[in-house]
């Protein structure tokens, strides 16, 4: 999931690939403002971390029991790594949703969204308003993660 979201972010933020959006969904002044460029760095580095954490644990099997057993269950370690990957995936998805909200505003297509998509868009915009000036986005990313973790949307 995290890899798919990161690739979609790359498409969304890369103006020469998508052909319809400004670089990094920048709604400010190109050359002066960065849009979501720094957030893409976060998504990419988080994706790289997830890829590293997704390596199988069995390659780290350690003999034990006086070398009588060479198959060691790494279930707990794997579960902890999987939990980290899931948490990281929320961060990547949050950045993707932020980019999609900016893209919807740039394209002015709010009225073309389905009723459910429009509801989600409006909920997101209630805590992540349209922006043109550069500011740190870590608080918005955390709010988006909280939103994505809500059970009923």
Per-region residue spans from a language model:
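C-terminal auxiliary extensions adjacent to catalytic cores
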Residues: 2-153
């Amino acid at each position: 999931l995290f890899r798919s979201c990161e690739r979609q972010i790359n498409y969304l933020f890369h103006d020469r690939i998508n052909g319809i959006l400004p670089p990094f969904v920048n709604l400010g002044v190109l050359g002066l403002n960065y849009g979501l460029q720094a957030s893409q760095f976060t998504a990419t580095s988080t994706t790289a971390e997830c890829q590293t954490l997704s390596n199988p644990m069995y390659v780290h099997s350690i003999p034990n029991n006086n070398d009588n057993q060479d198959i060691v269950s790494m279930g707990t370690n794997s579960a902890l790594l999987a939990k980290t990957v899931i948490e990281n995936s929320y961060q990547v998805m949050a950045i993707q949703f932020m980019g999609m909200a900016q893209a919807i505003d740039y394209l002015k297509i709010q009225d073309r969204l389905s009723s459910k998509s429009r509801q989600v868009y409006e909920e997101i915009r209630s805590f992540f308003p349209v922006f043109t000036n550069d500011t740190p986005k870590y608080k918005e990313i955390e709010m988006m993660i909280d939103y994505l973790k809500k059970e009923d949307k």
